[in-house]
Amino acid sequence: MMTGCVEEYEAELPESETHLLVVNGTISSGYSQFHLSWSEPLENANKGKDRKSYSIEDVKPVEHAVVTIHGTDGSEYKCTDDGAEYGYPTGIYSCNMPMLNPDVSYYVIIKCNEGTYRSTPEKPIRTPDIETLEYFQKDSLSDVEVLLTTADPDNPDKTSYFTWDYKETWEIRPTRITSIYFDIETMTRKYMTKDRQYPKRGWKFGRNEIILAGSTIHYAGGRMSKYQLLDIPRDDERVSWYYCFDLTQRAISKAEYEYELACRQAGWEMGGLFTPQPSSFPTNIRCTTSSNRVIGYVGCSLNTIWARMYIDCTKISRILPKPNKLKKLDDCQEVDCMRMTQEGKVLYDWNDGRQAMQPLVTLWGEPEDFDVRLRGATTEKPYYMPPFDE
């Protein structure tokens, strides 16, 4: 499996390799989307040199392009510019599509100020079903693995190639709970009313930021068997409580797989495709009006397969997130409590022994330990997240 982390990749490119059209997208049944951008130089990098530096962050969306999908049967579908709806350029062009004909080849034509670009016609590839999507933990000290098994392909004697996209949703909870706070107006401790209480739960979201691609070359029968898509450490907050994994599977051609593999080996990631020699990487897109080079590959899919899997926190061994260290104030005065409150600290414990000639002792915590919203969570529960009886 090809995995990695998203990092800024700076490459040195000759002038002939600059301002390249970058195409990300697939012709698909139902819905097709293309993300078009231009590679742009880092103006402040390598000053005084005749070569320019590029970064994955330095891309500019293609504006006012005309993007159409064509079939060799004469069919034609025009994509809309999503940026027109938002009022600013996005470089995203999309259109609704009928079910593709497996006997017809499809290609995309992109027209913009810099020229006309066309992809090679390809027949749509059928994606086999997902037989099982499951999680596995070898023992109580092991990470949690997300495993995939695909159904039988049309031709078990041929190697199958896939790409996967996934989305994650997970529940988080406060690492500390309190029912009290210090009221600055009355300069005393008070119990929280319901409207002041911190949320008991929150939900966070993520998706793959790396290219996930694989082949069945090392599997019998042209199908993936218990193929590891993801590895989650048992101390990761994602598996602290309830976790949901949504997977979209797409079968691709060998040529597209080789393109994805080249991206991986060059350190490319989604949203940025730059390398010292882009022209040496495989592509099925060319400029028909000039010798301008293109980065990207336009695949063609008859269908995609979706599956969902849950991880139940009670069925695995996991380590819950630890809160920050509490700050203890011995012989505390109300003015100290006011200062701590103004600094954003949260009152965790109040032990007032002054009536018995003992000091007031307070404990204070960091706000993110009490409020899941400060850890990037939403308090609006997604409809698909357990428990479902609420």
Residue ranges: model-predicted function:
Residues 2-4:
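C-terminal motif of bacterial Sec signal peptides marking the signal peptidase cleavage site
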Residues 6-390:
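A sequence/structural signal for flexible, mid-protein segments enriched
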